[in-house]
Structure formats: structure tokens, C-alpha cells
Amino acid sequence: MLPKLLVVGHGRHGKDTVCEMLEQYGYTFQSSSKFCSELFIFNDLKDLYGYANEEECYADRHNHRTEWYNMIHDYCKDDLARLGRNLFAEHNIYCGLRNKREFFAMKNEEIFDYAIWVDRTDHLPTEDPSSMSIEQWMCDYTIDNNSDLKRLKKNVDTLMRTIFRSRGLSLPASTQLPLFEEFADS
């Protein structure tokens, strides 16, 4: 069984890109924002902002970060690990958690195995704590996304090799591609 991964970091720092790369290792994911948009956010906001459909609501999420953060927190107010349990029931990656209280509730319930921070602070700003209260020090690992896409792929591969080795797991055949050999000595 694959270890469950919580992938976090500031907005637009590459979390979804990292999760897409993790699919080569057998993982599945859906952005937590997309999951929540489909589950309840679109229904709650469609009349307020005049969204024609869920896709339009989801595409506009960056303009309402604090509002989404608060809505997701309200969804979890009586059970801080609720969303994590729901997401991990369908996927083995939770991509995009933003609330530290929910983070610690899930960690205490051992809902995920590893928390991974995606960092791109050399190029992009950090978020205001009103929409992101998780901090890098809380996570088990950090993936550096301050270079190019090839380097990011190498960094993801290095981390996954470490995690798989520590768990006694074999890497999937899909990771034995020329892409991964390109950085073998770097």
C-alpha cells in the first residue's frame, strides 16, 4: 500500500504539478479546492458571484482565497479531520491543505503518513496567514521548486526513492524512464 501524502505549500508554488508527477508512482489525487468546490463551495457561492457552473467557480478561487479558506474551515469546524478523511477515502494524496488546526488533527489521527512542503519562495511570494496557516517546519519533507521543471522532477524522484526505500517498497516501472536517468549523477 502506498503511503498517504499530504502535499502543501503557498498558492501557485507547484503543489498540483508535484502531485501530477506523483501519479507516475501510482498515486491519485484531486486538488482539495476542486474537491470542495464540487462538494459544497459552488452551491454556496453560485448565486453570490453568478457562477454558471462549478468549473467557473473553481477557476475563480484565487480571487477569493480567504473566503474559500473560511468556508473549508467551517465545513470542518465540528471535526477538524473531516475533509482529510473524505479526501483520503478516494485518493492517496491530499493536495492543498491550508489550515494548521486541520493539519494537526489529521496528523494526530494518523490520517496521512508524510507531509510534503512544495517551496518556490525564490520566485513567488508567500501567502497571508489569513488564507494559509501551515508552515514549512510542520512538514516531514520539502521539495525545492525554485529551478526548472527538469530539476523539480529530479527532486520529486529523489524524495520518492527515499520514501519508498524507507517503507520497503519497490518503485513502479513507470519511474524507470529516461527522464529519471538524465539526473542520475546530479
What spans do the regions from the language model cover?
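Extreme N-terminal starter segment of soluble prokaryotic enzymes
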Residues: 1-5
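Glycine-rich phosphate-binding P-loop
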Residues: 6-22
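Short, acidic/turn-prone active-site loops that include or flank metal/cofactor-
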Residues: 10-13, 32-37, 118-126
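Short, well-ordered alpha-helical microsegments
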Residues: 15-16, 37, 99-104
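Post-Walker A helix-loop "phosphate-sensing" segment adjacent to the P-loop in P-loop NTPases
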Residues: 23-31
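ATP-dependent small-molecule kinase phosphotransfer cores
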Residues: 32-92, 98
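ATP-dependent NMP and nucleoside kinases share a basic, alpha-helical "lid"
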Residues: 84-133
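Small-molecule kinase domains that catalyze NTP-dependent phosphoryl transfer to phosphate-bearing small molecules
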Residues: 117-185
